[in-house]
Amino acid sequence: MSKRESSKYKIDRRMGENIWGRPKSPVNRREYGPGQHGQRRKSKLSDFGVQLRAKQKLKGYYGDIREKQFRAIFAEASRRKGDTPENLVGLLESRLDAIVYRAKFVPTVFAARQFVNHGHVKVNGVRVNIGSYRCKPGDVIEVKEKSKQLVTVLEAVQLAERDVPDYIEADHNKMVATFVRVPALSDVPYPVVMEPHLVVEFYSR
């Protein structure tokens, strides 16, 4: 198992949920946590614990974003007009690594970040190697010509178990995607329930 896969499944085990809907997730095989004490009855979480868990799950889903960076994203969501939970999700889904993942150019969000960081992606014809780069509606994201034959890309396109959401248009023959619009929370195909309103409560304590 690769280090990237190990990190991904570690998050699943920590959350006790298959947060990416992956068939190989260890939580599909058991309903309790890892380790010798995993089968003990879970204690009821406090309000703080529920809020913390919601934050960890949302952070984890997008590749275990570092706390400092995630807090900065939340701060921007709070400053923007409109509903803060909706703004938060919109900002997360506007990340370049998230769009590369949603477009099914790679199998996981972890792979998407690495793929971008290694310089395999262009935005509007310009190479961008920052996973957190924020895309705007109308931006065209494409896999570099020399990168289209990478095994990771080919397997993702051929074996993907996810549908491309309607706020992204993807051409898998050309490996080009367009970020059509910033989605609402209800548009995002999370395999599990995400509760960004609890993230707002956590940071508003």
UniProtKB/Swiss-Prot annotation:
The record ties this protein, via CDD domains, to: S4
Q: Which GO terms describe its biological process?
A: ribosomal small subunit biogenesis; translation
Q: Where is the S4 RNA-binding domain?
A: 94-157
Q: Which UniProt keywords apply?
A: Ribonucleoprotein, Ribosomal protein, RNA-binding, rRNA-binding
Stretches of Basic and acidic residues bias are at 1-16
What InterPro entries is this protein classified in? Ribosomal_uS4, Ribosomal_uS4_bac-type, Ribosomal_uS4_CS, Ribosomal_uS4_N, S4_RNA-bd, S4_RNA-bd_sf
Q: Which Pfam families does this chain map to?
A: Ribosomal_S4, S4
What terms describe the molecular function in GO for this protein? Answer: rRNA binding; structural constituent of ribosome
Hey, which family's this protein in? Belongs to the universal ribosomal protein uS4 family.
- What subunit structure does UniProt give? Part of the 30S ribosomal subunit. Contacts protein S5. The interaction surface between S4 and S5 is involved in control of translational fidelity.
Q: What is this protein called?
A: Small ribosomal subunit protein uS4
Species per Swiss-Prot/TrEMBL record: Rhizobium meliloti (strain 1021) (Ensifer meliloti)
Source taxonomy lineage? Bacteria, Pseudomonadati, Pseudomonadota, Alphaproteobacteria, Hyphomicrobiales
